[in-house]
Amino acid sequence: MSTMTDIGASGALHRTRSKPWYKVLYVQVLIAIVLGVLLGWVSPHLATNPWIKALGDGFVKLIKMVIAPIIFCTVVSGIAHIQDARKVGRVGVKALLYFEVVSSFALILGLIVGNLVPVGHGLAAKPDAGAVAKYVDQASHMSSVDFFLNIIPESVVGAFAKGDILQVLLFAILFGFALMALGERGHRLRDVIDDTAHAVFGVIAIVMKAAPVGAFGAMAFTIGKYGPAALGNLIGLVALFYATAALFVFVVLGLIAKFVGFNIFRFVGYIKDELLIVLGTSSSESALPQLMEKLERLGCSKSVVGLVVPTGYSFNLDGTNIYMTLATLFIAQALGIELTFTEQVTILLVAMLTSKGASGVTGAGFVTLAGTLAAVNPALVPGMAIVFSIDKFMSEVRALTNITGNGVATVFVSWWEGELDHDRLQANLNRTIDPSDVETAITTG
């Protein structure tokens, strides 16, 4: 693969530079987002038309349609290509250790910022408990035992049908080990799975052409339904969350990136296409396949990418972690409830558990917030209605932070494993090798 990706790099780079700006995907998505905002602002009635909403929802469903097969193929392929079974366990342990440490930093950062900048004080909130009843009901059934049992699918077909990432991941790991145990007898099936992965990535390439349409519909509906007035006094929380997420990405993740040997700003620029897609859809899952492919091109080990990225979507949700602690403090402040130091430590410990597997729950961060509040102090639960109307605006930054965090985690674990191609890493981040050329070379190869 490295040979294919090296051939004709300079020629493709020239072609990319000469490509009209309006044909570049991230430019199209950015324009679509701006147009969506304008439509939602100028004509809320038109923007909230079900067909406008369907544009965004439809695009996200198209992406989610291939999430399960992508995860299955990449994880199985990654394990099957490893000759030493101990390596899989080693990579998994390193990834989980990294997730716990960095997730703890995210949770603590949310607590610190929420205490230093108490934007919830003085709101005199009057929450509507009924607005969040369904989320609390979902969260009330979530326990550590239920979470563990939910990882095990009742049937393989059911796991794929529901698109449950953790269940598909478990089956893929078991299948990968079984295929690896077959030795040479399993090589033909392994090659078929590799080819299937390439075909599914081809489907993704086709679907991605509709990304601007999906981003337009999602953004137009959001602005049209909620509008700038919906933020009201809550604009402080939104701004504070944005600033805290940026602080985490460029300082915490920036230090990790510097330790490994790359620049976080260049890395963010490298995955800008994926970030813009996530911004338009508010779903980090919508960019999962493209992120995995780009990380491989960046120089990360295929086996590490196949294990770390899917696992990170359930165990390394940095944006969701920041949101949970920050939103919990905000709700307490708005309701006039003073949380003691012990209660805040309890929030931290509980959130470390409830944040795991958030991607497998409808409502993601909002549902896990319900679980955290219910476990720490039930009196805080009705206050969820305070942030309910602006959760959509914060979900975008949650998703952006999550995908960036998982990207950095994959590079770090690849480096930790000694399987990071530093030359290719620097070449891609410095734009001496254009990502689109590598994609073309892999496809044609």
Swiss-Prot record:
Subcellular location, principal: membrane
InterPro entries noted in UniProt: C4_dicarb_transport (IPR023954), Na-dicarboxylate_symporter (IPR001991), Na-dicarboxylate_symporter_CS (IPR018107), Na:dicarbo_symporter_sf (IPR036458)
Keywords of this entry: Cell inner membrane, Cell membrane, Membrane, Symport, Transmembrane, Transmembrane helix, Transport
Membrane topology (UniProt): Multi-pass membrane protein
Domain of life: Bacteria
GO biological process: L-aspartate transmembrane transport
Similarity comment: family membership: Belongs to the dicarboxylate/amino acid:cation symporter (DAACS) (TC 2.A.23) family.
Protein name, entry field: C4-dicarboxylate transport protein
Phylogenetic lineage: Bacteria, Pseudomonadati, Pseudomonadota, Alphaproteobacteria, Hyphomicrobiales
Gene that produces this protein: dctA
